[in-house]
Amino acid sequence: MKTINYYWRLFATAFCFFVFGVGGILIALLIAPLIILVYRDRQSRHIKGKLFIHYCFRMFIELMRLSGVLSYTIEGAERFKKPGQLFLANHPSLIDVVFMIAFIPRTDCVVKGKLSKNPFTYGAVNAAGYIMNAEPEAVLEKSIDSVKSGNSLIIFPEGTRTTPGGDFKFKRGASNVALRGGFDITPVIIDCCPTTLTKSDKWYHIPPRKLHFSMAVKEKISVDEFLDEKSANIAARSLTKKLEEYFIQEINNLCLN
């Protein structure tokens, strides 16, 4: 038998999705044009846009917490504060990127092109100047330039949300950014318990109890040992394998706790 708490969380989840949608439209209609009007320089405009989205997402996270949809913990949150970092994270849930942007002040990320046309997201995407996932070489160069300019770049190296119980495979794009840019990697281990908002879940498929979302920001992984490889492809493949093994071990440790 489903409890009053379950139906409250279902209502609260619907309300949070409603707020997110309305907020996205308001950003597109009011905030994004205002930022463009006030800040004529593109770089300044995108910095202000990123900060605005950061604060909006932080308030949205608190709305979900206060309404009883979820609780959260962050281990090593102080590591989010330093600018110009490359963050790699696993991707179990739809709200992973919302959490990361909410707690990293000046965040950049690679987004699907369709988000720049979606009425609920295009305002935020354009205001912040997020990187469109288009031609691979252009994405690589823009990603490197973004980190060098002081943004912190988020990459989910799986390329999509993790399928529960499925294979854990990384694409090489994140390794190419790290190696070409000479950036150490800050790994973030994300856990959702119970699982929710996976690729196969609808928004109303809420878990039987309140979701607890956790992020553990780990110590940097140096890429120096891979920079001397004669072949860039071999270096990227080797680093990707190391990262896969690292994340698999960390996630398995979560399952044991």
For the regions a language model picked out, list residue spans one by one.
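Non-catalytic C-terminal accessory region of glycerolipid acyltransferases
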Residues: 140-257
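Short gly/ser/thr-rich secondary-structure transition/capping motifs
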Residues: 66-74, 133-137, 197-200
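Catalytic core of membrane glycerolipid acyltransferases/transacylases, capturing the structured
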Residues: 33-55, 67, 81-135
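A generic structural signal for alpha->beta connector loops
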Residues: 69-71, 106, 127, 150, ...
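A transmembrane-helix-recognition feature enriched in membrane-embedded lipid enzymes
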Residues: 2-73, 123
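Glycine-rich helix-loop-beta junction characteristic of Rossmann-like nucleotide cofactor-binding loops
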Residues: 76-80
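Hydrophobic beta-strand scaffold residues
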Residues: 71-72, 132, 153, 185
